Amino acid sequence: MAEREHRRGRREEREETPEFADRLVAINRVSKTVKGGKRFGFAALVVVGDQRGRVGFGKGKAKEVPEAIRKATEQAKRSLIRVPLRDGRTLHHDIEGRHGAGKVIMRTAVPGTGIIAGGPMRAVFEMLGVQDVVAKSQGSQNPYNMIRATIDGLKKEASPRNVAQRRGKKVAEILPSNDKPAEAAVEA
């Protein structure tokens, strides 16, 4: 018994460094019907990220709100994904994500645009570290579905390096250069 408590103490000592920011997206009161009546509890939905290209989400259920949030945060940290960002501020290309009846469309944006996204999507982009993006949610407005659809779309994003590697080319061959549109206009 003493050893078990000792291990717990060690776990608390190495508690996470504040490298991750977290955002509580939704909290619901849930109930379970049992023989004697209803037992109430809470479900929390949390998004966690390092604001430098990693993001994850988690949900937790417990009898008390703080415990539900703690469980959701732990699950979110275990489900982190890495997303390549262009110039550390926006997406490389337009993407679409789906989950259930939810559909999310995310588009790149020029500097200064800001995060134009609703509710749960905004939390994901802020925790990811995106500064300029335009996003639209269609279909299900359920926060769980919106976050899962957003994460699904972000998993599909490919950096120019990944695309070049798959095609067996160099990054410079894939990215459009700035002088080509001018040359095309002169020739026309």
From Swiss-Prot:
The keyword Nucleotide-binding does not apply. One of its GO terms (molecular function) is structural constituent of ribosome. The keyword Ribonucleoprotein applies. Coiled coil: none annotated. Keywords: Ribonucleoprotein, Ribosomal protein, RNA-binding, rRNA-binding. InterPro entries: Ribosomal_Su5_D2-typ_SF, Ribosomal_uS5, Ribosomal_uS5_bac-type, Ribosomal_uS5_C, Ribosomal_uS5_N, Ribosomal_uS5_N_CS, Ribsml_uS5_D2-typ_fold_subgr. GO terms for cellular component: small ribosomal subunit. PROSITE patterns: RIBOSOMAL_S5, S5_DSRBD. SUPFAM superfamilies: dsRNA-binding domain-like, Ribosomal protein S5 domain 2-like. Residues 158-188 are annotated as: Disordered. The N-terminal domain interacts with the head of the 30S subunit; the C-terminal domain interacts with the body and contacts protein S4. The interaction surface between S4 and S5 is involved in control of translational fidelity. Part of the 30S ribosomal subunit. Contacts proteins S4 and S8. Belongs to the universal ribosomal protein uS5 family. With S4 and S12 plays an important role in translational accuracy. PANTHER family: MITOCHONDRIAL RIBOSOMAL PROTEIN S5 (PTHR48277:SF1). NCBIfam families: rpsE_bact. This is Small ribosomal subunit protein uS5.
